[in-house]
Amino acid sequence: MKSEIKNAQFLVDGKPFRILSGEIHYFRVPREYWRDRLEKLKACGLNTVATYIPWNLHERTKGTFDFSGGLDLCSFLETADELGLKVILRPGPYICAEWEFGGFPAWLLAEPGLRLRCSEPKYLSYVKRYLEAVYNEVRKFFTRNIILLQIENGYASYGNDMVYYEFLKKLADESGYQNVLIAADGDSDIRITTEVPDGVWRVLMCGFSNPVPQLELYRKRQPDYPQLIIEYWDGWFAATGETFKMRDQHGIVEHLAKALEHGAHVNLYMFHGGTNFGFMNGALRSGNHYRQMTTSYDYAAPLTESGDVTELYRKFRELFAKYNPEFSAETPIPSDLPKASYGDVRLDEFAELSENLDVLSVHPQTSVYPLTMEEAGGDFGFMRYSAQLPAQSIPIPVTITRFQDCGFAYLNGKYLADFNQPEATFTIPANQSGTLDIIIENMGRTDFLCNLEDNRKGISGGVILNHQRFHFNWTSAPLPMEDLSKIKYGALPEFPVQKRPGFFRGRFQVETPMDTFLMIPGGSYGFCRINGRLLGRYNKSGPYYSLYVPATFLKKGENTVEVFEQDYLARPMVRFADHPNPDMKSFSTLE
């Protein structure tokens, strides 16, 4: 299989090929559901699937690569090939995607002098190792179904280092890949006029208006190339605490129709959004304003977070039937997977965080100043900082300088205060001595804009006592919250439990595992686990009030649900429903 561009036409094996693509991120979808989502993509009239590749999952530990289980990229590509789908591969190294740190591994931030997305030598050495590992993994698909390979992502929105850009192209050229290379950018003047390496097809990201004028600007910039919208935004992401606003879906369909009438190739971003399982949500920051992405990455896409067909899917399918000669409008649409309501589950066990800090701490290190999460070898979750304080005859104010993102403090295991960025100040009562524990949560690293390097989590400044001096000599330890097996659960305390961050556990029976949706009606803010697998964060401020639980997380018989509540749990129960809250299908404006 050979892809190429001749006379401003995209060819596959010497014949014109119209790219009608949809984006699905394999790492946001349970492996067991890859085929279901890809079959629905093909049944929508599409002939290609696009995916990013997250460096921070495949090389979470420096020098150790993982392409197994849910990260088995080759299995995803194989499934696509079996279904006759072409592939657009987008390996980064930066992916944005509302994903934690834009896909970069956190350990890059612990490297002295390293600078991101430029020709800084140390950064280039790590990029080379990562991309060579990816290319070695997928090489057999270079001649089977990978028709486009992206070498950078929105680089004109970040920098203009052509040495770096040429380095990425050279890595791709030397990998054995001989098909078309692309570079994705937005539509502003400064982005369009930024250079890309020779021989690289510049492709467009857009979706909020008629894309034809932007496509024409790209045509003028590269007259010998066709036009591809690599990200046609058919929905949008959601940030915690913000009101969800559904975009005008009539306009989305209408603008896509104009692009197709204009002759453009398209990739729907997203075709199926999926879920930011675990602590993998990204964030945005402007000054002191921090926006945390939600666990759900539903995106108001043609397929819902749980893979259900929407009215938008059906409208897109009608449209693509006009432009895909190999697709029949009579093709059946695969059925949605069954959902179950398992009802209310009582949380009848409790473990206070302060009493379990030692068993949750990983590789504690002592130092004069507190270590950042990255310096301490952590990446996701929380950080613990411990120090001994002498008693003082007066109350002592404590100020934490330069920290991310939020946290709370204990004195001798007793809850003292909570705080949020950008400032943290609390008071040690008079005549109190002992162990001060400060817990800082990484709520998600930013994934976009020029502040990517300002993503060091935990404490990057210091702790000042009485507004006068730093307190030195700290023990710093990551709390990844991945292994809770050593937590000591006990009986549920008398309710209400206020300002006692801790773990609640309950058990429930399942006869037939099916997809379901977990709700925490009395919860404030925290995260949930099912049978030891981390689902993700929840927040009473919305806009999503449920967590998607794939059937693959459940088992026949007894199941366990654990809730870590950081603030206040009003009721010791959770609920499993057969629909999400909100139900995104009910937002459709096309019915």
Regions found by a protein language model. Name each.
Residues M1-T48, E78:
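N-terminal carbohydrate-binding accessory modules
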Residues G63-G69, P93-R117, Y165-K169, G199-R202, ...:
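Aromatic- and acidic-residue-enriched segments that line the glycan-binding/catalytic groove
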